[in-house]
Amino acid sequence: MFLWLAHFSNWLTGLNIFQYTTFRAVMAALTALAFSLMFGPWTIRRLTALKCGQAVRTDGPQTHLVKNGTPTMGGSLILTAITVSTLLWGNWANPYIWILLGVLLATGALGFYDDWRKVVYKDPNGVSAKFKMVWQSSVAVIAGLALFYLAANSANNILIVPFFKQIALPLGVVGFLVLSYLTIVGTSNAVNLTDGLDGLAAFPVVLVAAGLAIFAYVSGHYQFSQYLQLPYVAGANEVAIFCTAMCGACLGFLWFNAYPAQVFMGDVGALALGAALGTVAVIVRQEFVLVIMGGLFVVEAVSVMLQVGWYKKTKKRIFLMAPIHHHYEQKGWKETQVVVRFWIITIVLVLIGLSTLKIR
């Protein structure tokens, strides 16, 4: 919204700063951060008053039983902060902004309904897996179709392999949709599985979103993208504003979600943030880079799939408990140790992902 102020730069030279993506990206992060910090206490009080307490699973780590009753659905604060900040600092004429907000709010609505069922019916399992998959699939397919037909040229419909500049595989509409589906739905569920300890998901989301913001900014500038041999995606630079808004909103939320957590983000936050990260990766054609930078999310999801699959086949477990962060808790790691060590791993992975900008 503030972008329109740049049109009056002839009257007041200082207003010209609003046309710069970098300035608006920084301001989007600060706005979302301030929003989360300002409305965080009110959100916690409101969720507590509405008795939106988390029903802790009895088959989980026994140390988590003390968390029973902690307000959940705090992700609604994150989503509101991202939406407000993006609308204030983003370019409303950019279709990617609306696709990202649509994915964020649509999957957020699913998460909200899931959390609401858990709160009202005291059912830790929430909505059925089938219902959740149908909803997520619908959002992913619609977003994938929109992004495919927005592509300006065939370079926007290729599969980029990190570290190899000569490998770029054409996808076509079916391949593009399949890859978009796997990226959006997979990341949504992976982030949701990661959100099992205080602060475990929030900060890695900040790190990955920051990394993707750099890719978005570079991909949206023809000279930069050509120099780094990345596909040029016209308008992708505005996606960086959405990403930095996500960073600010999650950092502000982390203030209240840090151990011992005053509030949990719930599915309303985790499902939406994961889907948004996946959509950004599809826009900038960096699905494999997302796998690298979001390696923590991948490992968490794979640990669950391996555990379930192996148990169904052999009636034995690979891990003491899944997702894998609970495995390390069962081995004697303190919750804070697991969280900080997983943060460190994510920092390293994001740096490796960023190295693909130049190492080819």
From Swiss-Prot:
The chain crosses the membrane at residues 24-44, 69-89, 92-112, 133-153, 158-178, 199-219, 239-259, 263-283, 288-308, 337-357. Keywords: Cell cycle, Cell division, Cell inner membrane, Cell membrane, Cell shape, Cell wall biogenesis/degradation, Magnesium, Membrane, Metal-binding, Peptidoglycan synthesis, Transferase, Transmembrane, Transmembrane helix. The keyword Transferase applies. One of its GO terms (biological process) is cell division. One of its GO terms (cellular component) is plasma membrane. The keyword Chaperone does not apply. It comes from the Bacteria. CDD domains: GT_MraY. HAMAP family: MraY (MF_00038). It is found in: Cell inner membrane. It catalyses: UDP-N-acetyl-alpha-D-muramoyl-L-alanyl-gamma-D-glutamyl-meso-2,6-diaminopimeloyl-D-alanyl-D-alanine + di-trans,octa-cis-undecaprenyl phosphate = di-trans,octa-cis-undecaprenyl diphospho-N-acetyl-alpha-D-muramoyl-L-alanyl-D-glutamyl-meso-2,6-diaminopimeloyl-D-alanyl-D-alanine + UMP. The gene is mraY. One of its GO terms (molecular function) is metal ion binding. Pathway: Cell wall biogenesis; peptidoglycan biosynthesis. NCBIfam families: mraY (TIGR00445). It comes from Neisseria gonorrhoeae (strain ATCC 700825 / FA 1090). Its main location: membrane. It is an enzyme of class 2 (transferase). Catalyzes the initial step of the lipid cycle reactions in the biosynthesis of the cell wall peptidoglycan: transfers peptidoglycan precursor phospho-MurNAc-pentapeptide from UDP-MurNAc-pentapeptide onto the lipid carrier undecaprenyl phosphate, yielding undecaprenyl-pyrophosphoryl-MurNAc-pentapeptide, known as lipid I. This is Phospho-N-acetylmuramoyl-pentapeptide-transferase. Its cofactor is Mg(2+).
